[in-house]
Amino acid sequence: MNIYIAAPFGNYIKPKQSNVIPVIGTYTLERRRGLLWKLLTTLRYDFKEQCWYNSLGLRNPGLAHGIDKITHGEVLSVAAIKPTDYDRLNAQIPLDIPIELNISCPNINHFKDYLKGIGQFQPRNPIL
């Protein structure tokens, strides 16, 4: 059984066990400055819901940086900002890079059909 360490923790925790896999990212097609004013509250634990929240606005240096940074045994987390991004993400990410599709970002609420286009991705091992 594999255990995945979700981003952002996967960016920093690099275990030596072969079945523990870091997920790095999340990356978007273009660089995003994110919501810097949320830096203090971006990673917080909600005791009532018993879960962690991460809402920094997908701040990242862009997909090309993520592709260059990823190493064997890691999963690349990516997110679309608009529906047409899925085709471009699929075209730019090499097939030998496993991916996680971040569809849970609370800051992506400006297009209704957020899941439209996910089926465009070619088979990979794994798609999370």
Can you annotate each of these PLM segments?
Residues 46, 68, 85-87, 96, ...:
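Acidic-enriched, low-complexity/disordered segments with a strong bias for Aspartate over Glutamate
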Residues 1-74, 79-80:
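N-terminal capping/small domains of soluble enzymes
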Residues 96-105:
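Active-site groove signature of glycoside hydrolases
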Residues 18, 36-38, 91, 113-116:
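Short, glycine/charged-enriched secondary-structure capping and boundary segments
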Residues 7, 21, 93, 97, ...:
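Intrinsic-disorder/low-complexity coil detector
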Residues 16, 67-73, 89-96, 118-122:
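Acidic (Asp/Glu)-rich catalytic clusters
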Residues 33, 63-64, 82-87, 105-125:
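Active-site-adjacent beta->alpha loops and helix N-cap segments on the catalytic face
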